[in-house]
Amino acid sequence: MKYALFSVPVGTIYDLPQTIKEGEEGLVSTIGDEGLYGQACQVRTAPGGVTAAGVQLPPDVAEVVSFYGYHGYVDQRELQFVREEELWEYLGADLVLVGRATDVLNLPKVQGVRMMELERGGVLRRQPETAEEAEAHKGWAKALLTDGRTGYVRDVALEPVKYEMTAVFSQREGLAFNDALAETLNTTADKLVPEAVARWYGGSEDAFRAAVCEQAKKYMGTEYRWGGKSGRGIDCSGFVSSAYMQCGVLI
């Protein structure tokens, strides 16, 4: 079994191996969801392979399941394929959430060369620095990209990652997502939410609800996009899922 990280700011997850299909009024998109930079997924079928259902995939399309259980198809150019041990190492690193649209620069200064433009919800690996290094570029964080390059982002653009992506290792056909996540966390599905609320909000449901509302407000002004999950465009399920996800609960 293989794994991958989304290596583009916003990757598209289609519900079919084909990106369009015939609708009642003409061609329509088969987009179902989006994967954001640095998010993990399980690769069920490699590009060009044959799925368990007997579907022959195009040579550039992979069958995936996101870390929160969404099944679909992704262009391989939007993925960085990794081995299991590499993904475990990645998930064990100091991960940070991109809290707003931001640039990754090659230097810790505004004049640096723009390496990538990330959207809210993307994930980066924060790199350790000595006290002297941190003081030398105060206000900037050193981050590792999925392709191994190092860049810098403004500290104010980053938030802690409060959710787990380890369900990618246990997800399998016939197993509910909550059970898959609980399996990797050595708990039970009914305890996932209470444990997240206890960890991040001291067990206060009121504090958790307030945090979800604050995260939701950060998408104000974002246009509606079918299947969207970023500041470029978002739909109703993507909006709710993202707000809860950023507060530590996967739904």
PLM regions with names:
Residues 121-122, 221:
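Glycine-centered loop/turn motifs
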Residues 223-238, 242-251:
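Catalytic cysteine-centered active-site loop
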Residues 1-13, 18-29, 36-49, 56-96, ...:
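Boundary regions of SH3-family modules and the immediately adjacent low-complexity/disordered segments
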Residues 38, 216, 236-240:
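Terminal peptide-recognition signature
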Residues 210, 214-218, 241-245:
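Solvent-exposed, polar/charged alpha-helical surfaces in well-ordered, non-transmembrane soluble domains
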Residues 42, 122-125:
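Hydrophobic beta-strand signal
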Residues 196-198, 219-228:
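Short, flexible active-site loops
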